[in-house]
Amino acid sequence: MKCTSVNIRNVLDISLKKKIKENTNLSDDEIIIIYKRFNYISSNGKLNYDNFEKSLGILGSIQNAYLYKSIFKAFDLNNDNYLDFYEFCVAINIMLKGNKKDKLKLSYRIVNAGFNSNEDACVHKSSCMVNKFNTKEDNNMNGDNINGDNNNNHNNINGDNNNNHNNINGDNNNNNHNNINGDNNNNHNNINGDNNNNNHNNINGDNNNNHNNINGDNNNNHNNSHNNNSHNNNNKAENSLGQPLNEKNINDPINKHRNSQSIIYNINDEYNEKIKKNKKQDYSNYITYENFEKIVLSINDIKRQLLGTGDEIITSQIKYTFRSLSILCDDGIYRMNFECYKKALKCNEFLKLLGIHTKVADVFLQHELLKRKDKNKTKNGTMRNRKKYKNDSNRIANHLIIKSFSESTNTRGSIINDSTSFLFLRKQKKKKKKKKKKKKKKEKKAILYERKSTFSSSMENKSQNKSQNKSHNKNIKSVSRILSRVNKLSSTELIPNECDHKPNEEVKSTSDVLTPIFFNNGDEKMNHDTDGNMVYHKNNVDDNLVDGDVVSQGKRCSFFSSCENKKNEENKSITFNDINSGNINTNSCIMNNMIVTKESNEEIINEEAQSSYIYNKNIFCSKYNTKKDKNEPLKCDLFECSFINNDKNIVRDEDSNHKNVRKTDDYFIIDDNNIFDNGPIIISKNKTNDRERKLLKTFSSSSLKKKSLLKNYNYHIKKKNKDPNVEDTNMLYHDDIKKEYDHKVTKNNKNTCNNNYYNNVSFNSSAYYEYHSDIDLIHFSNNLKKKKKKNVTSPRPSSKEYERKVTYHKECCSNERMKNIKVNESDLGMFCVNNDKTNIEDVKEKKACDVLNRGCIKEQVQCKISEFENDKGNEIYMQEFKKCIEKYKEYVNQGEGHLKDEEEEKNDDEEEGEDGEDDEEENDDDDDDEDGDDDEDGDDDNDDNDDNDDNDDNDDNDDNDDNDDNDDNDDNDEKSNIKIENKKDVPNIHNNNDDDGINCCTNLFKDDDTLSALEKNVTNNNLIKIMSAKYLYHKFLEYKDFMKNNTTLFSHFNKIYQHEDDKINTDNKDVLNYRPKHNNDINYYNIPCEDQIKSDEKKSLLNVEFGDDIIKKKFFISSVNSHYVMINNNLTKEQMLYLIRNILMSIEDYLKKEKNRDYNKIFFLFFSIFIYNTQNGGDQKEMHEDEKWDHTNINEDKNVEKNDDYKNLSNNENSVYYNTMLRESLWNKKKYIKLNIFKNIILVISIVRYFLHTITISQKYTSSYDSLDDSNMIKSMNSLKLNEINILLNRASEILEKYSLGSVENKKVYINKSNYYNSSKKGKLSVSLRQNKQKKTFHRILAVYFGHERWDLVMNMMIGIRISSIKKFSINDISNYFHHKDVIQLPTSNAQHKVIFKNYAPIIFKNIRNFYGIKSKEYLTSVGPEQVISNMVLGNLSTLSELLSEGKSGSLFYFTSNGKYIIKTVCRNIHNLSKKLLPKYYEHIKKNPDSLLTRLYGIHSIKYQNNLGRKKKKIYFIVMNNFFSSIVEIHRRYDIKGSLVGRTVPETKREDHTIALKDVDIDELGDIINIGPENKERLLKVLKADADFLKENMLLDYSLLFGIHYRELSKDVVNWEETKTNQINHIYDYKGNCIASRPFHQCDYGGIISVDKKKIFFFGIIDIFTKWSIKKKFEHTFRTIQKFDGKNISCIHPNAYAKRFVTFIENHMK
């Protein structure tokens, strides 16, 4: 019997309904609908797993899938093996209406095999509801043994972390499992005796002699239920990440203490506190590796069985990802708690395993581990058991470790975007008393260190000095909460076998110096934690040392280091000597994973002939003072650690390099997409099974691309490979790197990098091939050729030189922090060379922040600033620094009073008045004014960005990289169509590409009268760059004058300006009074800093620290390549870092529009760090004229006209001279100064970032390795200097990425769904229609959830399309392509209910998709069900519901996740008509590639059994394009038919931009399609051709879907000055047939940019399948009589309809 709503209300219990409403967001109607569906899929009000599996529809055809079981367990809150209605409502509410937190908890339970923790289970408002409901439904007060589940799970359901059954019922917590099991017989007897106060048996009144009578179980089960091993059931089954676990010794008193939870009375508080510390941590609610692996494999198996395809999943890949995102528990097993899982869901690699696909994740996983198939199967040594250390109560052990990925800046959730930048550690308890710590110092003990690791390629050490004042502690309070008490965070360094302490090394006591290296005695059971409290070791682990060739590789070793904070004491570094006397100065031994004993002047590691490599990370350390025989092998435990013997050539020398390299095609191309990302990942390639023969290849995690590159890029690679000695240029060998850097040092001023490498970043990946059409590739290829012609002026270098350039380009632009490794000719092994002269400087610098953490980088920078300021040695410097800034502000404000904060608001109002409208939705994080915002948008799309979907990241400041006169472009080069510059008019300006990291408004001067004159000579982009460079130089002169006038006040600042001699001053005067008489001999102002550097015999500290390759590095100013800056080598390293930190903080404050922002401070800091300089070049004359105008008050126009030299200039020079005048007249205007400030601030941070990046690739730093191989986990973090630089580099990258628009991350893809408004009609007929509509809407509430009819429909549609699209057909067997029909039977959970899927004309539609450039992979992933299956794991189905909408005809619209395609259900008549018109439609779009008609990508039907009845139901649907899918938002849309009767929307509805306005509204609002005469003619031609096609086929009632994106409302990145409508849009074959199309009206972000550059228009003709039939004729007659207007009504004859349609649109075009 079909239930009505009334019957359901009567059946549903009122109290249950009230309970559901209190704890969910469901309405009464929704509860009733869900109840109806629940009763249909369940039996007797209880839904078991079998019925739940059937409710999944086609997904449930995969029986007993682990994923479905986990989902079922997650829904089952009370663990009774079935779902009642309450649990079902809670689950549906979370998946459809729940907030992000509830969905996250549900997802956590799903992945954790349905385990319900205290937080997770209570998703409703009252946690006690679960117990009450369980008591009512289950009649079980305890439920401990009902499900046979682990006891630990049950305890967590009720919010108790203790493993005690008494807590289940809220009884006294005095009983304990261990005591029950024989730990204390007296206690056990009391439990079962007369004293029933603490007994479970009293609860149910059962026999008191048996503890397990609560559940009515056998009395003999007492020991089993309370056996101590029951707490370890999960641990026994877990062999996480290949680590065998030790069985715990029950008789061991230490274990008993760890597992004990009893409270011992009559003892002192100190002993009781020790007992609490020794409690065992409960990890039962943590996700284990086994659970995660099962989920991943289950998802992949479901996709493989349903779709016939599945991703290639490697177990080691899952292992590596899980381990990198999890924490190491005190029992030596990696687990993932809720916080870890929360962060992991932001990691692309983690989401990829769960089936959430993004381009970044695809690139990462396709290359990360698939190349490891040749990996050595026999691993060196087995994974040993970890030692169990005691820790504080309810805390994870101090040696928690997190493996890390490298960072990535991809916008879709890359690893650096919060996914791996947090530390997964619990809160630390307060520090212990100092007295206890002093007592423990005297004993022989070991200090355990709590280690942390971030997801970055670098680590930073931070020593929190206790002597710091309280104000400083407040500043770092938020940091200290996360970072805890980490004294030193060491990083692995190259450690030779010959590793001694220097005999003359001054070493302080072991408490204040680096923890000595010692041998860990296996018999010793006593150790100490960081607070000096005694903890115990268990002597049940076998640890061995691998020492060169003496000990086999099967053995393991680990070195540990630790150090301790001391008041007023400095840590000394221990120096290790290799056999070649190369010193490696370290602060914390630079060995992460080693335990060695210290003997003051004795050898630590046996001397061997060759040095060895240690590569591992993140192990805690301990120390022990007992002297051992130095030859005694080390005993330690290690998760994964091993040695590589250097006697086997890891890196070949120059003679054997090319001979020993194996030939392989398995190489990777370094992509330049994110140049400054942190964290190299090292992939090791095995030629044989010997580990020693591995070759290390470096590449970035975000740069892992497929082999397929664009042809033009491969052309360069082939050119490089002409050298016969080079077999694989993508392999970066260490000796080659050495050569490259030697080449770089010797030819410092030569630019070896061509800028057009930086302009094609986003195209150098296979993702461009897969997700873009052939048209995009052709545009890219053409532009690349044009740029090549434009930029290549000098003859092509030899193959060797070109190889050096390209390889150096790869090295500079990759994300890795590559540091050279020098190869010793006498020793083929690798060793580091550190030229640091003093250990004191190392010690001071290495007191850095604890962790490189994206979430707290700002706090770390502020922390270091405070530390520098509080240093007593910097008092004088800080006093002068503060005075100098104050004086500078006063000095500058005298000349720039118009830029004060009071005047800025006036300027904003003026600019708003010029624009005509006030932008109320402007982002606060953008520029300072509207012009600045437009400036950012304008320069976003660079010249090579022909594809709208893949724009380059404009954050790259690569135009500052080593520009040189050798790269000057030839004046006679062929003129390019790309708008960069007019070379004929500006002959001396070169390399002015738009990829300079500065986004500016290309339409800034649209209201200026001088714009027309400027456009004739120089493009707007170039003009703005020159203006900004001119303003920067003006600020420099201002700074220089200030420093000269205050030389006596500030003795510590920029001595370069304080000690200039009279000759220099004379030269400066000559410069200011310059007249252009000698054009060829311009002697520009040149600061003699280079001469001082060369002549200064005693180098400063910066020279010692960084070397000449950094000190002499030139950072060129954008657009004026003769101007550059160099680092001020008179600064000390600490001063330089302090100034950089200050400039980063100041820039961010300014860009955030803080109240106290000050741009003058930014320029002051910048010129204090860098010295502005010039060199003789073509741009000097232009800038020199600007200087003259800067320092003269004479009227420019009159002087220029009277100047005889100006009259004698040639035409080109004349235009340059005139343009320079115009620039001067523009840049000094008030409204443009703020633009110049913003552009220069972005330039400043770009230069700072590139300078920091240059340090990381400097010769003085070795490479950072991070191998993905389990046995080769390398984490050589080099030194703390690099880590400090990386912190600042990350901070600079974050600021530049956030505030300089143009990044891919800032892009959004808008689906831009339309809502339909139908005016209500009066009369009885309209009333009945409204009632029917309400009923339909009522039944469509919550259309998608388990068991619902729409769920089956959507799943069947997506899976049917997915399967049919990959099916291959034999063309010879198909007689008629248009009438071909492919029939597929989809799997179902019920064999009797068959689902038939039909795909019509599959070959034709595949050709149509190819015609419009749709790749098969992109189409399948868009319409396929992969995302839905994965979203089930994430506890989220709301996305599916949001993508579903109802059309005005009642049709179901499903938008794909990327918004490009729409699946629309249609009636049978439309279905038949579409098939009938398909041949004509196909021919029409072939002849008219720019057609506006809806693009059909597929016609399908599904026939299935209706769940609500026994009749079979057939659904027809089509797949078509979404005209409004764009990276910009549609602010207004119209649905135009040409009719005026009833074609309007009320004003109250017009505010909703998702509602399509109509014909009358466009006249009232006055919107005009102003696309220019050329585009108007083309559009009208296409429109008439489409109208004729529709007229010929007697079609009507179609409409033009017309959308508008307004510039004034835009928050998206748009290059308004460049349109692509005139580019090549179609490809024709030799017969003249179009084989590929890209309509011109979709070239500009999916539309056409208007002539006034203020709008983007989108067009498309929809609803084209309405036939002129008898029904329409009758409607025409009826409406004519009703409205008394036969012409303006909608339903008219197709001929008249087409004519009216075209005429109406033409009248609204301009």
Swiss-Prot record:
InterPro entries: EF-hand-dom_pair, EF_Hand_1_Ca_BS, EF_hand_dom, PInositol-4-P-4/5-kinase_C_sf, PInositol-4-P-4/5-kinase_core, PInositol-4-P-5-kinase_N, PInositol-4/5-P-5/4-kinase. Residues 68-98 form the EF-hand domain. It catalyses: a 1,2-diacyl-sn-glycero-3-phospho-(1D-myo-inositol 4-phosphate) + ATP = a 1,2-diacyl-sn-glycero-3-phospho-(1D-myo-inositol-4,5-bisphosphate) + ADP + H(+). GO terms for cellular component: plasma membrane. Residues 902-973 have a biased composition (Acidic residues). Residues 139-255, 427-479, 895-993 are annotated as: Disordered. One of its GO terms (biological process) is phosphatidylinositol phosphate biosynthetic process. Pfam families: PIP5K. Its EC number is 2.7.1.68. GO terms for molecular function: 1-phosphatidylinositol-4-phosphate 5-kinase activity; ATP binding; calcium ion binding. Residues 140-235, 456-468 have a biased composition (Low complexity). Keywords: ATP-binding, Calcium, Kinase, Lipid metabolism, Metal-binding, Nucleotide-binding, Transferase. Residues 236-248 have a biased composition (Polar residues). Ca(2+) binds at D76, N78, D80, Y82, E87. Residues 1334-1709 form the PIPK domain. Catalyzes the phosphorylation of phosphatidylinositol 4-phosphate (PtdIns(4)P/PI4P) to form phosphatidylinositol 4,5-bisphosphate (PtdIns(4,5)P2/PIP2), a lipid second messenger that regulates several cellular processes. This is Phosphatidylinositol 4-phosphate 5-kinase. The lineage of its organism: Eukaryota, Sar, Alveolata, Apicomplexa, Aconoidasida.
